[in-house]
Amino acid sequence: MAEILERSGYLVKVRVEVPADRVKASYEALLKDLASRVRVPGFRPGKAPLKVVEARLGREALLQDLKERLVEETYPEAVRELGLSPVAARVVEQDLSEGEGFRYVAEVENYPEVRLPDWRSFALEVSPPEVTEEMVEKALEELRQRYAELVPVEREAQEKDHLFVRTEEGAEFPIDLAKALPHVREALLGKKAGDVVMVPVLNDKGEKVREVRTEVLEVKTLKLPELDEEFAKTLEAESLEDLKNRVRESLKRQAERAYEEARERAFLEKLAEGLEVEIPPSMLRAEERHLLEHLAEDLYRQGISLEAYLEALKEKGELEKFQEDLRKEAEKRVRIALAREKLAEELNPEVSEEEWQAYLQAAARAYGVAVQDLRRQFGEEGLARLKERLRQDKAVQEALKALG
C-alpha cells in the first residue's frame, strides 16, 4: 500500500507499506539467490542449507540487503499507483521488524507542474530580413577571395602574403601571415625571397625558449579574379548580372532563415522566462552534467582535458563565474525544454505519417546513415523521443504562425 504523506511543489513525501507475507517471500528468494552464489565450506556450490547460509552471511547484513531489495521491487509500483512521475528520490525512513511488514518513507522529486504565460500576447522584437546592395557587393568580394590564386612576387612580404620557408632542420612549409602567430608574423614581415631570419619559439607562458633559423624561399600574394562576365561564367552564371541576382536571392534565403530562427529563439526564450514552474534540483544538476560532458568532448578534440581546463580557470580566478554561468545556462535549457513540452501538450499538433517519414529521412541524412540503420540505432524509445521532438517543433511553428 502506498500513500502521499505530504506534497510541497515538486517534493512529495510517500509512505509505502509491504505486507509481512511479501517480506517473508522476498527474504526466502534473497537467501536462495545468495545460496546459489556463496561458497560454504563442506558444501557443494548451491547445496548449503539456507540456515547455514544465513548464519554465514549474518542476519543484519541480510536484512539490509532485504530492505534494498524490497525498495527496488515496490518503489516503482508505488509511484505508478500514486500517479507520480519521479525524476529523483531517496529513502528517508525505514522500519523492518521480525515477523512484521516493511515500511519506508521516500522523498520524491516529482516532474514539475508547468504553467505557460499568455504567449498569444507576445510581441517579438525581431528585425525583418533585409538584403542591401552593400551585402551583395560584400558577398561578391568574398567569392573573388574564394577563387583567388596565389602568385609569386619579387618584393618584401606584406600583411596578407603567403611565405614558403625552410628551417635549419630542412623542413619546408607555407605560412599564411594573416593567420600566423604574432611573433612569427613580426619576424617575417618585410622579408623577401632569399632572406634568412631567426624566428623565436615561445613556451606556454609566452617566453622565448629558443630561435629557429628560417630561410624565406618564396613570397606569394593573392591575385583576385576580375569581377566580370568571364568570372561569372566560371561560376555557371549566364552573365555578371545573372551572378549578382543569384547572389542576391541566396542572401535573401539566408536572411529569411536567420529571421525565422531568430523569431523562434526569441519566442522560446520569452516563453521560458514567463514559465511558472518550480524546477527540481536533480533536473538542473543533470543538465549541468550534460553541458559539462559536451564541453569535455569539445576540449578533448583540442587535446585538453576538462580537469586541466577547470584548473586553469581556478588559477585565473574565473572558476566561480564559470560555475555560475553553467548553472544559468542549465536552468535556461531546462525551462525551454519544459516550455516546449507544455506548449505541445496545449496545442496538441498531429504528426502525419508523411511528416514523420520526411523527418526520419532528414535525421538520417544528418547522421550520415540509412533510415533503417537510424531506426535500429535509436530503438523504440529513441524514435519515440524523436517523434515527440517533431511534435514540439510543430507546436512552436503553430504558435509563431498564430502570432503573425
UniProtKB/Swiss-Prot annotation:
Domain of life, source organism: Bacteria
InterPro entries in the record: PPIase_dom_sf, Trig_fac, Trigger_fac_C, Trigger_fac_C_sf, Trigger_fac_ribosome-bd_bac, Trigger_fac_ribosome-bd_sf, Trigger_fact/SurA_dom_sf
GO molecular function: peptidyl-prolyl cis-trans isomerase activity; protein folding chaperone; ribosome binding
Protein EC: 5.2.1.8
Domain PPIase FKBP-type, chain residue ranges per copy: 160-225
Gene3D superfamilies in UniProt: 3.10.50.40, Trigger factor ribosome-binding domain, Trigger factor, C-terminal domain
Catalytic activity annotation: [protein]-peptidylproline (omega=180) = [protein]-peptidylproline (omega=0)
CC per GO annotation: cytoplasm
A Pfam cross-reference name: Trigger_N
UniProt keyword annotations, A-Z: Cell cycle, Cell division, Chaperone, Cytoplasm, Isomerase, Rotamase
Subcellular locations according to the entry: Cytoplasm
GO terms classed as biological process: 'de novo' cotranslational protein folding; cell division; chaperone-mediated protein folding; protein transport; protein unfolding
Domain commentary: Consists of 3 domains; the N-terminus binds the ribosome, the middle domain has PPIase activity, while the C-terminus has intrinsic chaperone activity on its own.
Family, per entry: Belongs to the FKBP-type PPIase family. Tig subfamily.
Function: Involved in protein export. Acts as a chaperone by maintaining the newly synthesized protein in an open conformation. Functions as a peptidyl-prolyl cis-trans isomerase.
Protein name (database record): Trigger factor
Designated gene of the protein: tig
